[in-house]
């Protein structure tokens, strides 16, 4: 599956979405800082699952209805930073959709996440990430899960990786930095955490009008890779036995 995550910088980059969908053919689109009051029902061939409701600039998830069927979408409030208490910019920092994959005939959970801004401590963001993962496990117990978005975590990502590993998740950074607005805070802000999925690539896409660059996550189901490996090994064993019996040909 192919998932794009994009922080629109107060909805400024909203006009780029159709072109992104057409150029990169994502199955899912996860947005942060989008105008939730005026979201289109469709972006290219992607359908709006839902968006956050309690803040004008919020989160949204779009998905390909030919590939997926939406079972349930839910928004979550996470622990607030001082900035949230004073400015109240975001009540809900997580939205997630439980989907049925009509191709693989299985369910999984995808989420769009926006952590507290850099005025907060990394410890608060780790709390938000941990709580988000716990909420996702309740939405889809035991299901493969992908949470993408603006983690606002440009430094000490090794520690973050260790923390999410302890809860059964993997942290994956993109191939190049995703944020360039401030000289001293450039780096990987937009990340992916996953469980039960094999993330083969996270690509930083070209910059548009946002201060964040979109990322494109390519992932497969972990046990699907195992089944393919087992099948290949079974085929290899079979080839060896045939070769031993028939010296005139090799399969």
Question: How should these model regions be labeled?
Answer:
Residues 14-15, 38-42, 46, 122, ...:
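Short glycine-/acidic-enriched loop or helix-start segments at secondary-structure transitions
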Residues 28-109, 113, 198, 205-207:
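Structured beta-strand-rich core segments of catalytic domains in phosphoester-bond hydrolases
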Residues 112-132, 155-164, 172:
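Active-site-proximal segments of metal-dependent phosphoesterases and phosphodiesterases across multiple
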Residues 20-23, 41-48, 127-129, 162-166:
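Glycine-rich, phosphate-binding/catalytic loops in enzymes
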Residues 11-15, 56, 186:
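Structural motif corresponding to alpha-helix initiation and N-cap regions
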Residues 72, 137-143, 151-251:
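Metal-dependent phosphoester-hydrolase catalytic domains
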Residues 3-11, 80-88, 119-121:
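Acidic/histidine-rich helix-loop elements
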Residues 3-8, 17-40, 62, 97, ...:
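Active-site beta-strand/loop signature of hydrolases that rely on acidic residues for catalysis
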């Amino acid at each position: 599956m192919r998932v794009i995550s994009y922080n629109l910088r107060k909805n400024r980059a909203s006009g780029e979405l159709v072109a992104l969908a057409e150029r990169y053919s994502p199955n899912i689109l996860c947005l942060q800082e989008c105008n939730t009051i005026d979201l289109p029902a469709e972006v290219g061939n992607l359908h709006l699952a839902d968006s956050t409701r309690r803040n004008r600039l919020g989160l949204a998830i779009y998905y390909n209805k030919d590939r997926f069927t939406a079972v349930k979408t839910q928004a979550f409030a996470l622990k607030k930073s001082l900035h949230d208490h004073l400015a109240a910019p975001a009540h809900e920092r997580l939205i997630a959709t439980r989907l049925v994959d009509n191709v693989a005939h299985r369910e999984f959970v995808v989420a769009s996440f926006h952590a507290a801004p850099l005025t907060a401590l990394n410890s608060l963001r780790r709390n938000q990430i941990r709580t988000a993962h716990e909420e996702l496990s309740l939405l889809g117990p035991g299901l493969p899960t992908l949470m993408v978005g603006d983690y606002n975590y440009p430094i000490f990502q090794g520690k973050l990786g260790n923390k999410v590993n302890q809860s059964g998740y993997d942290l994956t950074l993109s191939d190049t930095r995703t944020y360039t607005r401030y000289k001293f805070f450039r780096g990987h802000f937009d990340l992916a955490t996953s469980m039960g999925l094999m993330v083969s690539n996270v690509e930083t896409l070209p910059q548009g009008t946002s201060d964040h660059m979109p990322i494109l996550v390519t992932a497969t189901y972990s046990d699907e890779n195992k089944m393919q490996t087992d099948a290949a090994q079974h085929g290899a064993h079979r080839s060896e036995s045939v070769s031993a019996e028939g010296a005139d040909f090799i399969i």
